[in-house]
Design a protein with these regions (language model features):
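N-terminal glycine-/serine-/threonine-rich phosphate-binding loop
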Residues: 1-76
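General beta-strand structural signal in soluble alpha/beta enzymes
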Residues: 6, 33-36, 67, 89-92, ...
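Conserved active-site and cofactor/substrate-binding residues in soluble primary-metabolism enzymes
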Residues: 15, 19, 28, 43, ...
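Active-site histidine-anchored catalytic micro-motif
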Residues: 27, 44-48, 60-69, 73-128
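Anionic-ligand-binding alpha/beta catalytic cores of soluble enzymes and soluble regulatory domains
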Residues: 117-182, 190-191
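A conserved acidic, glycine/proline-rich C-terminal tail/linker
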Residues: 179-245
Length: 256
């Protein structure tokens, strides 16, 4: 059975989600539609990309992922269908694709499929659903549009020198854990076995990496590398972002 996932910033109180599902089922009744999340903050492309990037490979190859965050089409932000790692994505190129693809090779096209209505404010229902079904039915990208090179994201990358790494909070999850843009690979590369101090929130420091949240007593802060591969700052059984006064883009620095 074909699988189509949905990710959006619509929430669950309006008609948008069921309308899109209805459109998909009308075109392909025998399909499994999976909600990744509809609770992304409005227009928060970065968070949507982080969520999808960290779960899409757990789905079977051939799954189609519909990205419905900031979908309005323009000459700068075209509607695009993309294939990477044997998964398909349909959405608007507002840099969400480059955040998901990262350094992986991909194939992309600008969608040249007419939608069935004259309304252009609900492209996910009127166009993306149609393209997602086409991909689920095995239609090649070459029949959906012309080749396209996705836009590069201008997201801040960690800077580093011989004695420090300077990063920031990239994402805050439902537990208020602070996920940074510092990868474990970069940390180990620059650390080179040296002692280190992680500084954050203006006055807090950590001098070790934990394996789990339970490595420290309740209400103490800690640092670990999660399954996503990034440095994470958390408080055992509590909310790090709120209690530490931190937010996305807050600085996190590591000194050696």
């Amino acid at each position: 059975m074909a699988i189509i996932t949905l990710t959006s910033d619509w929430g669950n109180s309006d008609f948008y989600v069921p309308a899109v599902k209805g459109a998909i089922f009308s075109l392909l009744p025998d399909v499994n539609i999976v909600d990744i999340t509809h609770n992304v903050k409005s227009f928060d492309v970065k968070s949507a990309a982080f969520i999808v990037k960290n779960c899409y490979k757990n789905f079977p190859k051939g799954t189609v992922h519909v990205l419905a965050v900031d979908t309005e089409e323009s000459s700068d932000n075209p509607h695009v269908a993309l294939k990477v790692n044997d998964h398909y994505f349909v959405g608007t190129d507002n840099t969400i694709f480059s955040l998901i693809v990262d350094k992986d090779s991909y194939e992309a096209v600008i969608i040249d499929v007419m939608q069935d209505t004259g309304f252009f404010t609900f492209s996910t229902r009127d166009r993306f659903a149609k393209v997602a079904v086409m991909l689920s039915n095995g239609v090649p990208l070459s029949e959906i549009g012309k080749p396209y090179h996705i836009k590069e994201s201008l997201e801040f990358k960690p800077s580093y020198d011989a004695n420090a790494i300077h990063g920031l909070v990239y994402y805050i999850d439902a537990y208020d854990n602070l996920i940074t843009n510092i990868t474990q690979e970069l940390f180990e590369q620059e650390r080179a076995g040296r002692k280190f101090t992680i500084k954050f929130g203006g006055k807090y420091t950590i001098n070790k990496i934990c394996d789990s949240y339970q490595d420290v007593p309740s209400s103490e802060h800690l640092a670990l590398f999660g399954t996503h591969g990034f440095l994470e700052i958390a408080i055992n059984h509590d909310k790090a972002a709120s209690l530490l006064g931190m937010h996305t883009d807050s600085s996190v620095d590591i000194y050696f």
